[in-house]
Curated annotation (Swiss-Prot):
Belongs to the HPrK/P family. The keyword Transferase applies. It comes from Lacticaseibacillus casei. It comes from the Bacteria. The Walker A ATP-binding motif also binds Pi and PPi. It catalyses: [HPr protein]-L-serine + ATP = [HPr protein]-O-phospho-L-serine + ADP + H(+); [HPr protein]-O-phospho-L-serine + phosphate + H(+) = [HPr protein]-L-serine + diphosphate. This is HPr kinase/phosphorylase. Kinase activity is slightly activated by fructose 1,6-bisphosphate (FBP), and inhibited by inorganic phosphate (Pi), but FBP prevents kinase inhibition by Pi. Dephosphorylation of P-Ser-HPr is slightly inhibited by FBP. Mg(2+) binds at residues 162, 204. ATP binds at residues 155-162. One of its GO terms (molecular function) is protein serine/threonine kinase activity. Homohexamer, arranged as bilayered trimers. Six HPr molecules bind to the hexamer at sites that overlap two of its subunits. The gene is hprK. Residues 203-212 are annotated as: Important for the catalytic mechanism of both phosphorylation and dephosphorylation. The truncated form that consists of amino acids 128-319 exhibits in vitro enzymatic activities identical to those of the full-length protein, and also forms a hexamer.
Length: 319
């Protein structure tokens, strides 16, 4: 988890324009993902002013400010420009009032702009800041994108996670991270995984060493990050352990208190794990779309049992 993000990093990531204060972009730090739209503050009410947030001015705020006198506008904007305020941001390609530039420059605050509508701009910046400021954890496993579904493969060392990922890449899927996966919570129900920068695009195969997946298979074989939708746990098969054969038992694993669906796949000589995991991802997607083969089978089986019981009863009655 990063404690802060510089305004320059924000500008680069979200493609913002710099109206003024280029020299302050590295000095100003963003510590909160929340954004403030200063409505009451423009009327002079500062009792609960969130000065440590980015101040976003949309069409409403700019229109209201233009109805003030120049002196009143400058006075209000100077009160808003505190030493903790990261930046002033103007949406919809609107022109920043001259008094905003003056007040911001005096307080060493950059003034930024974007052509995006206010709501979309707010969502874009909040999403970026959430991803950068969120708490991060490291998990042991391999993260692969299979048909657009983020699948986290876990299991003991030596069980075959990296080799399985390599075969999945050969089958056209994309690698995100091998061995160590950095995860963070994007929102209440979304967990995102990525590779640590030093391990990005790399895969370790016993006997071969470290291989660069992007150089060997091309840019289409890797991704920077993905939402973790499914966990596949590889476990060595033992005769005394019972594994779910029908897939009727639903498992989950908590990551940051978010339950992520999980299946356990027994590892045994001769089993093609890559194909099994690929099919598991497709089956999970089918369930998400409302089709569950297990439930369909159980329903048909129950109908068949009921039919056979009725047939037996009728046969007994005839006798």
């Amino acid at each position: 988890m990063a404690d802060s993000v510089t305004v320059r990093q924000l500008v680069k990531a979200t493609k913002l324009e710099v109206y003024s204060g280029e020299e302050y972009l590295d000095q100003r730090q963003v510590v909160l993902s929340d954004i403030s739209r200063p409505g009451l503050e423009l009327t002079g009410y500062f009792n609960y002013y969130p000065h440590e947030r980015i101040q976003l001015f949309g069409r409403t705020e700019i229109s209201f400010a233009r109805n003030m006198s120049s002196e009143e506008r400058l006075l209000i904007l100077k009160r808003m420009a505190t030493e903790d305020t990261p930046a002033f941001l103007v949406s919809r390609g609107l022109e920043a009032p001259a008094e905003m530039i003056t007040a911001a420059t005096a307080a060493h605050i950059p003034v930024l702009g974007s052509r995006l509508p206010t709501t979309r701009l707010s969502s874009l910046i909040t999403e970026y800041l959430d991803s950068q400021l969120a708490e991060r954890r490291s998990m042991h496993g391999v993260l692969v994108d299979i048909y657009g579904l983020g699948v986290l493969i876990t299991g003991d060392s030596g069980v075959g996670k990296s080799e399985t990922a390599l075969e999945l890449v050969q089958r056209g899927h994309r690698l995100i991270a091998d061995d160590r996966v950095d995860v963070y919570q994007q929102d209440e129900q979304t967990i995102v995984g990525a590779a640590p920068p030093i391990l990005s695009h790399l895969l370790e195969i016993r006997g071969l060493g470290i291989i660069d997946v992007m150089n060997l298979f091309g840019a289409g074989a890797v991704r920077e990050d993905t939402t973790i939708s499914l966990i596949v746990h590889l476990e060595n098969w033992t005769p005394d352990k019972t594994f779910d054969r029908l897939g009727s038992g639903e498992q989950t694993q908590l990551i940051f208190d978010v339950p992520v669906p999980k299946i356990t796949v027994p590892v045994k000589v001769g089993r093609n794990l890559a194909i099994i995991i690929e099919v598991a991802a497709m089956n999970f997607r089918a369930k998400s779309m409302g089709y569950d083969a297990t439930k369909t089978f159980e329903k048909n089986l129950n109908h068949l049992i009921e039919h056979n019981e009725e047939t037996d009863q009728n046969s007994s009655g005839d006798k």
